[in-house]
C-alpha cells in the first residue's frame, strides 16, 4: 500500500484511467464485431459502410486518448477497409 498522499492519489487515478481505457477498448471490439456481423449477414453496402465508419471512429478515438498505438490503429483500420472493399466487390459480382 502507498504511504504518501501523492502515491495514494496515483492509485486512485490509475484505477479511473484503467476503467475508462477498458470501456474504450470494449467499444472498439464491439464496433468491429458489429461491422463483421454486417459483412457475414451479406447486408447492404450502406449498412457495412456505416458500421465501418463507426468502428474507424472508435479506433481513432482510442488513439487520441492514448489507449492504442497509432500503428496498431492503422493496421486495424486497413484490415477492416480491405474487408469492406472485398465485400463491395463480392456484391458487384453477384448483382451482374
Swiss-Prot record:
BP-aspect Gene Ontology terms = translation
GO CC annotation terms, alphabetical: small ribosomal subunit
Give the Gene Ontology MF terms in alphabetical order: small ribosomal subunit rRNA binding; structural constituent of ribosome
Carries keyword Acetylation? Answer: no
Asked if the Swiss-Prot or TrEMBL record annotates the protein with the keyword Transmembrane helix, the reply is no
Q: Which UniProt keywords apply?
A: Ribonucleoprotein, Ribosomal protein, RNA-binding, rRNA-binding
Q: Which InterPro entries match?
A: Ribosomal_bS20, Ribosomal_bS20_sf
Reading the lineage from the top rank, the first entry is Bacteria
Q: Which Gene3D superfamilies match?
A: Ribosomal protein S20
* PANTHER family in alphabetical order: 30S RIBOSOMAL PROTEIN S20, SMALL RIBOSOMAL SUBUNIT PROTEIN BS20C
Report the family membership: Belongs to the bacterial ribosomal protein bS20 family.
Q: What does this protein do?
A: Binds directly to 16S ribosomal RNA.
The protein here is known as Small ribosomal subunit protein bS20
What is the protein's species of origin?
A: Anaplasma marginale (strain St. Maries)
- Report which gene this protein is encoded by: rpsT
